[in-house]
Amino acid sequence: MQDKRFGELLSEGISSAAKRQRKSMAAIEQEMAEVVGYSRPMLQKWRQGRHLPEDEIVKDLIHYCVTNGRLNRQWADSLLIHIRYPGREQLLAEIFADYALSNEEQPLNNDNGTEPEPACLESPHNIVPIQSPFYIKRPGDSIALKAIARQGVTIIIKGPPQMGKSSLLLQINSAAEQAGKRVAFIDFQQFDRSSLVEADTFFQQFCNLLTHKLDLDNHVADCWTLPLGNRQRLTRYMSHYLLPKLDRPLVLAMDEADVIFDTNFRDDFFGTLRSWHSSRAHNPIWQQLDLVLVTSTEPYLFIKDLDESPFNVGEVIEPADFSLAQVIELNQKHDTPLSSPQVQQLFDLLGGHPYLVRLALYLLMEQRIAPADLFSQAIEERGPFGDHLRHHLSQLRRQTELVEGLHQVITHQTCPDQQIFFRLWGAGLVRREGQAVLPRCQLYAKFFGRYLYD
């Protein structure tokens, strides 16, 4: 069984152990392999996400990383949640009973008065874990967290890719659990392609997955014998079986909703969610259900009837780019690799783009690049942001109308075609400033100004 995310988390653990023990990664790998009784090549397969070890081995791996890498409870919890480890809380209690290393238990200062060591560096490519020191709260966070504390709410998180939407969703889910709610997290990217072709298949699979997430007996087949349409069956299954079976409110947290926009049943599915939202006013059972949806696409391009859309109701959160003060804060959290003038230079270049700011500081902290080279090589195809920029360029060149639209933005600061604008905005390439439409940041203006028509 392949699992890339497990491999990334395990790599973080091995890297932390290597730094703490002042050993090479190879030495730590060999030591870990001996501890768990497997060969180093097998351990490397786990790191690469090519195989997933058995639960007992996972326990030993976590124990090693916590003991030797002083990784905190949040790291261990993220790994166990990801693989759906049975008895997760009990295992965490056992491990950290010996090593009191959770964030809450770590002292702010050592007894000798020295400053605490910098936080264990986290990859900018991953979702930011709960209580991570690298998580930056933005204005939308407080709105979302206040909303989820109430009952019967709908929250929409909308914005371009790599804005931290999934990380915010993780924060919302955690707050919901602390408020005594049950959370069912569904990532639409996990659906097989075959499940996204026929409406009947998708609606049944959605019910099956939701039932599995809630650890309830499956009665989907019984519901599908009723002479009803898919929308009515899904609604009945939710209101007559799932919600009544739960002893507390349910948060249905759905990430990557964009996947459904490309299907022929999007109107039926999203219309169903909208009807659940509206039904709270006259049916108490729906007060027991919170809806949280995350999308990178402007929904109005796909859902023609606004009364059938769940994306224009409830609390709509659009995560903002980082402010200069927040970039300064992140620079400090990364042990200040940039001087104050260089932080301003980074902010001017990236405009507070959350992913690119974190990527830059990560590369600097890892000493993969010097500050001067970061700026001088910024728009090179093989530079520090090269992978990110080449990906966008590749996507644009498949759609000539977007190339022309972005060129118009760069040269004339306008984009008369609203559909083109929203597609460029959805890709995170442009922004509005008053009546003008501008490239998202200086980096994009320079890079696409040079390479768009090459």
Question: Residue locations for each model-derived region?
Answer:
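A short, Lys/Arg-rich alpha-helix, primarily the initiator
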Residues: 1-31, 35, 59
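Short amphipathic recognition helices of helix-turn-helix/homeodomain-type DNA-binding modules
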Residues: 1-8, 12, 55-115
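Walker A/P-loop-proximal flanking segment of P-loop NTPase domains
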Residues: 108-162, 167-176, 240-241
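Conserved catalytic segments around the Walker B and adjacent sensor/switch elements
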Residues: 156, 176-195, 252
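Conserved NTP-binding/hydrolysis module of P-loop NTPases
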Residues: 196-219
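Mid-core helix/loop region of P-loop NTP-binding domains shared across ATPases and GTPases
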Residues: 211-254, 258-274, 278-290
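The catalytic "switch" region of P-loop NTPases
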Residues: 264-349, 363-366, 373-384
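Winged-helix-like regulatory helical subdomains adjacent to P-loop NTPase cores
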Residues: 328, 335-434, 442
